[in-house]
Regions:
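Conserved GHKL (Bergerat-fold) ATPase module
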Residues: 1-170
Length: 170
């Protein structure tokens, strides 16, 4: 009972800090992150409350809640199956070429380089069906978010008739 009470009070206080002093909360986020992630991974009741003040950091240094970030990237980072793809990098400097290629395509990238981030990613994907995290260096930039693209036919109908026997004879 005592641990549940303490957990609830901590979550309420963090929510209050987030709501009333967001810039100060963001400034302290890098120090708070591991404790909040650990709490979310180990205590379901804390996780329910913490989802409102858990922040994600983009490579530009801006902080977002999960809802804010997903709403921001939903239009450009949804694949052909309807999954919202959240791109992330664990080493911005070391994987700069991958980051720049993704940014050139108009994609937004999260910086997830903490000790518990891989566990948090699995947790978040298990709780949200239509969300997938993809590391920015896991594939070529064109395959990170698979869009349904149709190849335009560049042959005229006359050229198609000429080519048809060639392919049918194979």
């Amino acid at each position: 009972k005592i641990s549940g009470y303490i957990t609830r009070k901590v979550a309420d206080r963090l929510q209050e800090l987030f709501s009333t002093m967001r810039t100060d909360y963001e400034a302290k986020w890098d120090d708070l992150k591991i404790f909040i992630q650990y709490g979310m991974l180990t205590d379901e009741k804390f996780a329910e409350k913490a989802q409102n003040f858990m922040l994600w950091k983009s490579i530009e240094g801006k902080y977002y809640t999960s809802t804010e970030y997903i709403d921001k990237v939903r239009e450009t980072q949804t694949d052909k199956d309807g999954f919202t793809i959240l791109l992330y990098v664990d080493d911005v400097v070391g994987k700069d070429s991958f980051v720049e290629a993704a940014k050139a395509k108009g994609y937004d990238i999260l910086e997830l380089n903490g000790q518990l981030d891989s566990h948090y990613i699995q947790y978040f994907e298990s709780k949200n069906e239509k969300i997938r995290f993809v590391r920015v260096d896991s594939d070529i930039v064109d395959n990170l978010i698979r869009k349904e693209e149709r190849m335009a036919m560049s042959l005229s109908s006359e050229q198609q008739e000429i080519m048809r026997p060639v392919f049918e004879s194979q």
